[in-house]
Amino acid sequence: MLTQLKTYPKLLKHYEEIKEVHMRDWFSKDKERASRYFVQLESLSLDYSKNRLNDTTLKLLFELAKDCSLKEKIEAMFKGEKINTTEKRAVLHTALRSLNDAEILLDNMEVLKSVRSVLKRMRAFSDSVRSGKRLGYTNQVITDIVNIGIGGSDLGALMVCTALKRYGHPRLKMHFVSNVDGTQILDVLEKINPASTLFIVASKTFSTQETLTNALTARKWFVERSGDEKHIAKHFVAVSTNKEAVQQFGIDEHNMFEFWDFVGGRYSLWSAIGLSIMIYLGKKNFNALLKGAYLMDEHFRNAPFESNLPVLMGLIGVWYINFFQSKSHLIAPYDQYLRHFPKFIQQLDMESNGKRISKKGEIIPYDTCPVVWGDMGINAQHAFFQLLHQGTHLIPIDFIASLDKKPNAKGHHEILFSNVLAQAQAFMKGKSYEEALGELLSKGLDKDEAKDLAHHRVFFGNRPSNILLLEKISPSNIGALVALYEHKVFVQGVIWDINSFDQWGVELGKELAVPILQELEGHKSNAYFDSSTRHLIELYKNYNQ
């Protein structure tokens, strides 16, 4: 456990020594701070100079990582050891994008051979849709793709297709359905033509309640309009491992794309779950996405901790969570194309590390994953940055931006990028009472009024942030960015001694929903309901009589 590691008391002592130091002082004393605390991997870079740390902090954090055998655990993951201990599974999302020739054997399966076989089928299928060779039941080309999934079968594909819209096929419109509410699927069905729509049903077991409910609604709508169930074969494909259930649905087994237990949902966009991505972007751009992730994989596996991007970000996060007692972490992308990135990282981070039981089954006596949240930065400035600047919470921030200007939008990117730099500087530097008072007096305010108002215009600063810069929003850079966060999550899971690759926390609510659903549908359940739940069940039933 973290608190039992030999470096932990050293970090506690060091924290007490520097907790009141202001970053302004470090910057004023060290003119090389920005260049020293900067790491670049091809066209992705990290400026971590605006963090409340110094060389001693980093040295101790690297020692902490060594205490946890981080290097050895990284290797264990890449080699296919069953590090998902509660489910007795390997964790090999890295194999989905591997360019290595060295085969990985897992329970007598040749992993890379299997992965590349599925990729080959995905490429052939996506080519047929994009080229117009694959036609609908009236011989129309496919114009709309509807991806039906939830969680990891939705968020990754949605995020990537949105981020890389400039690379998408101009004929294809992408739609993503995850919510079982009914509104979302009905809204999508209103917009599309059954004769030119391809539905992708993404569910490993092909039994996920939300996904199957939406898929059956889409199926019913399609059959009513096409007039014959046989047309399902041309318009529905599945990403699943349950061949029997897929065939019962009416989907041809040749239109089923498999994936494996060694790939968790939130790590699965590189697999057949990314079929919608490949269809939209094409195989060349999908390959670039994989290549960017592989580049980050190799960096994570081989770079020394001192210049290792995921290791640095993971350890810096631990520094704030377990020593500064930070409870929250903000993701602030300054790019409209990255608007879904925060909620993708929410799932990746919180479903992986939102746990309080160690690998040995013991209750952990320290904080683990913070609340991860965010929005597009420029909008957030006018919504909740007030709290970040002058509120009572210490909330570290990841600013994410690109250097590349958008075409046909002169002056826009300069304004956007200036705000990234200004916000990061403001969070670090702040504004003292004396500075605020001087500004007010220079504007001609009465001295007594200025003294009172100046208190409200103080920014304490010393608010930490990372700045992640991409040269441009491209497939390879998005691949590298996602892999960076995947590995950062892994690093923190190792430090906290938790299994980052199960998600038992999603199960209890699903189990309890079964008897409640029986009651709502008019059937009697033998389950016990607390008085609140029973009252609300009756309220619903009475309203809908």
Swiss-Prot record:
One GO BP: glucose 6-phosphate metabolic process
EC code: 5.3.1.9
Subcellular localization(s) per the UniProt record: Cytoplasm
PANTHER family: GLUCOSE-6-PHOSPHATE ISOMERASE
Domain of life: Bacteria
Name recorded for this polypeptide: Glucose-6-phosphate isomerase
Keyword Oxidoreductase: no
One annotated GO molecular function: carbohydrate derivative binding
Major enzyme class: isomerase
Annotated family: Belongs to the GPI family.
Function: Catalyzes the reversible isomerization of glucose-6-phosphate to fructose-6-phosphate.
Record's keyword annotation contains Cytoplasm: yes
Organism field: Helicobacter pylori (strain J99 / ATCC 700824) (Campylobacter pylori J99)
PROSITE patterns registered for this protein in UniProt: P_GLUCOSE_ISOMERASE_1, P_GLUCOSE_ISOMERASE_2, P_GLUCOSE_ISOMERASE_3
NCBIfam families xref list: PRK00179.1 (NF001211)
Residues the record marks as active site: E351, H382, K510
